[in-house]
Amino acid sequence: MLFKKVDLENNIHDVRVHGDRILDIAPELVAEEGETVIHANGGALLPGLHDHHIHMNATAAALNSLSCGPPDVASEQELADALNKAAAQFPLQWVRGVGYYPFKGNEEHNIIDCDWLDKNGPDCPVRIQHRSGRLWIFNTKGLDALNMKGALLSDDIHRTGHIYDTDASVQEALASDPQNLSDLIDILLSYGITGVTEVTPRNSPEDFLNYLKHTAPLKMTIMGRPTLIDMIDKSTARVNIGHVKLHYHDHDLPSLETLTKEIEEAHSQGRGVASHCVTHAELLLTLAAIEAAGPSIKDRIEHAAIVTQEALDWIKQLNIGVVTQPSFIVARDEAYQQDIEQNM
């Protein structure tokens, strides 16, 4: 493959590539017979980009899901209209929505429920995911479908339609087969993204083998459960194991001693931890546990959505990384202004 007229450090050159090797760089190269030629017209030639925080299966599923939150949907009426329109296009099928966020503020009483979906949504099974990824909201037909799969649903779930990620009794019924990742991989490659870090907490050895089989030519680092260490001998130059993912929330935070032990065990495997931290409490507990365990240069914080100056200084002292999503400031500005305390 021959790249013509590319920008390399402010100089225009031609670059010849074969496989994963750069063979030649010169001001002018002549195309060989049968060689693919790409005319860059002065555009920069960059190494492949790496997405350091992605949920591959969830992102692939979202490509075929209905957007149920800002900026596409900005009110409950717009949500109802979108759900009914989607159901009309695919009658009798599940309507799967993602990205929902309460339009009046992210308090529990503002979140729609089963009754709202029954009254305002379509006459088919509906399942909507809160933007946090922690909550699914079902209508009655959706709950009936779960019952038919043998899920054990509490009275509270039947009343609200709310199923949180901690409701282990319904995880098997909610679980879907691995997604076809080919469309997502094509999209990533079209952006110049040639490698990703898969950050789903429940990633297991089985997930590792599935990614190994179905994600070429994408390079992948897969974080997840401690048991991923069993795949160390199956790691390749393209797919390898990464951090132990820690994923707790304010309502179910472990003790400092428990979290410290988890971090110590990850370090004993030669792995860092990647800790999901979107609240002040989650971040402070994580930093305290990393300090108690002894920080590793491999340790990192995911999101770091709320960081006080004190916490920032602590992160610097521990010399650990932060993988955040700066685009959230633009995409979620209104919600942040509404929901986050000003003194934070």
How should each PLM-predicted stretch be described?
Residues 2, 7-18, 22-216, 222-224, ...:
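Divalent metal-binding segments
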Residues 46-52, 302-303, 323-325:
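Active-site neighborhood of phospho(di)ester-bond hydrolases with catalytic His/Asp-centered motifs
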Residues 55, 237-249, 320-330:
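Non-cysteine beta-strand/loop elements that form the S-adenosyl-L-methionine
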Residues 63-69, 298, 303, 332-343:
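Short beta-alpha connecting loops at secondary-structure transitions
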Residues 210-242, 307-309, 313:
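Extended hydrophobic/aromatic segments used for targeting, binding, or gating
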Residues 262, 273, 279-286, 297-303, ...:
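Extended, hydrophobic alpha-helical segments in both membrane/secreted and soluble proteins
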Residues 306-344:
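Active-site-adjacent C-terminal substructures of enzyme catalytic domains
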